[in-house]
Amino acid sequence: MSLLVRAALAAAVVCAFAALAPVAPAAAPVPPKAGQVVTFPFPAKAPVVVQLTGVGAARERLSALLKGALGNDAADVEKLIDDGLKQLLADRKLTAVPKDGRVYLAINDIAALFEGTPAVSLLVPVTTYKEFRDTFLTADEQKTFEAGKGVDEVKLSAFGNDHTVYMVDLKEYVALSPDKGTADLYTTKFTHASTTGMPSELAKSFVGSDLALFVNLDLINDTYGEQIKNFKMLIDFGIQQAQMGGVLPGIGKKQLDAMKGLLQGAFQALGDCHGLVVAAEFRPEGLNLRVQAQFAEDTTSVKVLKAETPGPLADLGKMPAGLAQYMGTKYGKSFVEAARGLNAEFAPADDDEKGNAAVEKLQAALVAAGPQGEVAGIGGAANTLTVAKYADAKKAAAALLGCYEAMSAGGKVQGTILKDAPKVTADAQKHAGFTFAEVKMEFDFEATVKDLPEGVKENTIAQLKRGVAERQSIWVGTDGKQVVQVVAKDWAAARAAVDDYFEAKKPVGEVEGFKVTRKQLPADASLLLMVEVGQTATSILDSLRMVQDAVPGFPKIGKAPELKGPPAFVGLAITLKGDTATANVFVPGAAIAAARKIVAGLLTNID
């Protein structure tokens, strides 16, 4: 067993107490109130810390989540968890561990993880040190206990092996570590970490979650800044070499430049960032996952963030029900420009200088038109509706149509190569106060995948056809306030989609599953994505079936069980506000139940 696994073993053993905790309603973790300080038992200089907010309490909240998601079937899942963790605990008792006490796993030195014994420590809340020793240690382990001057030593048994662990009595906590030097640290007068020493938003997320990881990037940047800089240079060099050697098929110069810009931005953000929290919350309605970063004042990243004004994106709920994905965005100018480069919605061939110059100018005009938010519903190759608001919608519509007109054969629209130049018919239709132009395109799937390995070409074409019709019609219209784009099989279908949205015919916002997930996400967001579970799961499984024929040894996937009942949605909300960037993913109980049903069915059908 590796030293790293051995170091984490104590955490697994103590957290297994959750399996033995009595199941009863438990209040969610409470984040610190303004002015209220939470002092932690680990050193302020610990670069990485994991927290479990009460092994017993977290277990109770997980039980409530499972019952809400699985109903009577939750008992079977809980029994599997309980049996496995009871076996891990063996003869140990954890009566000396308060069920609401916070447990911490601190990485005291990142470099030491890869050099000898890892400098990690597990901090467990206890009633008393003596009671913990007498109840947690087995009879055989107690015989190996050796008292020291502040640091005691014991051999813990797990998986048939003995592991030396050092223990320190911290009164309300006991510190355990496989490294003697780390244990010695807890006998000295060290500076304790606290919520006052953490960025305010990160402190709330860290303390207010059931399970959370905190990364102190201020400390990491100070300690490893030079190594991070060298790593960035290595990646830059690797991208350049890959492009020169043709290792990145299908990626044009503009996309490569955008990738480099993204890389530059990522490392800039890393250097500007105070810290990062990755957290999970067990809610009765489902599971919420959060990734949050907070940045230092007077940095490039904060200047960009403070220009953002997230909103409720309420218009997303007006999209017609029955589609697979719904997405709304509200970004400022800087983010719109960055996304434009990465998305490459319009990418003339690299040797089409005239087309590239025209698209560059027109996309700049699109940004200058003042985007104020966009919502979209996506249902397949010929079923997409997008509604975008602009300060100058007529200018935006003209720029968008100009981009289509600037494309020629060999260029890419939405990543797929055009067989011929798009055919644009101005003023093709008028409806509901909108004047629509019609854009007809024909794609060349074979040319799109020509640089890919032979084994994956056929499957990639099949994937493309799921999202893009080989012959596609798009209607682009404006009423002077907003710009509408509709991908449909014909004008009748396009007109119906427009009516469904503007007349609120069966809007997705009235679907119960949509409402449940939206309520659990932040009220304001810069990006909101809602994914319908049934259609998305079917699409993913179909994609995996395509892969199984191309990859030797890939499991043969049978037919998944049909998902019945009302639609459920998994939601993602990204919020850029002030000095903080936050991503929340909410998985409702209905989605968890659907996932269990699919997995259980597949396990009986995989060859």
PLM feature segments, named:
Residues 28-160, 202-279, 288-382, 394-426, ...:
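Structural boundary/hinge residues at secondary-structure and domain interfaces
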Residues 1-5:
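N-terminal secretory signal peptides that target proteins for export/translocation
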Residues 46-50, 103, 120-124, 174-175, ...:
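One face of beta-strands
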Residues 19-29:
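Signal peptide processing junction and immediate N-terminal pro/mature segment
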